[in-house]
Amino acid sequence: MNIKFSPSLMTMDLDKFSEQIGFLKDKVDSFHVDIMDGHFVSNLSLSPWFIEQVKKVSDTQISAHLMVEDPSFWTDRLIDIGTDFICFPAETVNGIAFRLINKIHSSGLRAGVVLNPETSISSIESYIDKLDKITIMTVDPGFAGEIFIKKSLEKIVNLRKEREKFNYHFLIEMDGSSNKKSFSMIHQANPDIYIVGRSGLFGLSSDIETSWQEMIKNFETETGVKVNQFVNRE
């Protein structure tokens, strides 16, 4: 089964940047980069500059998750550097969503939206047909290691039904505490992409290869699904 993992680079060991990116780039579907402004969430994280550094050593897709009050400001910079997916918070785009999506698509890139645990699918229904990806937060955003919110998985199930019914093309991604304890529950909801961070991948060992193999073992043990460990992009 083609399980897609997207490592959250906010939780990687930056002292081992080249080593960890080099090992993961042929094994994962994409890299997940959190960009926070300290206002939408009470934290600061990675930046467009960081994405540029990743792109210098890897051609793996990069998905930027904006946790910012002004997504338009950040989107312009992310377009300039060719970020594959630009995903903005649903809570901040009322009145600019169509304009923002059109700008991203006009640049040949893909647009996504992120739903926090309290945010309903109905809030994006007016533009859901234009989205390339929908990310469901299964934790409160802003910090690694937050408590897993099982109820958020219902949105994944409902999005799959809606996608099939209306023939939408968006990918469904989950973000938050994806690890040995939650893999089985998440798999039952069946997202297209699993974002894995400290508890699911990077924190399992100081050695990235050991961490990766442990994550794969945990996933296969908890779900009964065999993981293809090499991504063929040809």
Predicted features, each with a name:
Residues 37-45, 49, 117, 125-157, ...:
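Glycine/Thr-rich beta-alpha phosphate-binding loop at enzyme active sites
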Residues 32-103:
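N-terminal active-site wall of soluble small-molecule enzyme domains
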Residues 8-12, 36-38, 67-71, 91, ...:
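Active-site beta-loop-alpha junctions enriched in small/polar residues
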Residues 27-30, 57-60, 79-86, 105-112, ...:
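Glycine-enriched alpha-helix->loop->beta-strand junction motifs that scaffold or abut catalytic
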Residues 86-94, 135-147, 189-212:
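Glycine-rich phosphate-binding active-site loops on the catalytic face of alpha/beta enzymes
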Residues 201-234:
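C-terminal helical cap(s) of enzyme catalytic domains, especially alpha/beta-barrels
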Residues 3-8, 31-33, 62-66, 86-88, ...:
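Hydrophobic faces of well-ordered beta-strands that scaffold small-molecule active sites
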Residues 19-24, 70-80, 119-130, 177-194:
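Catalytic cores of alpha/beta
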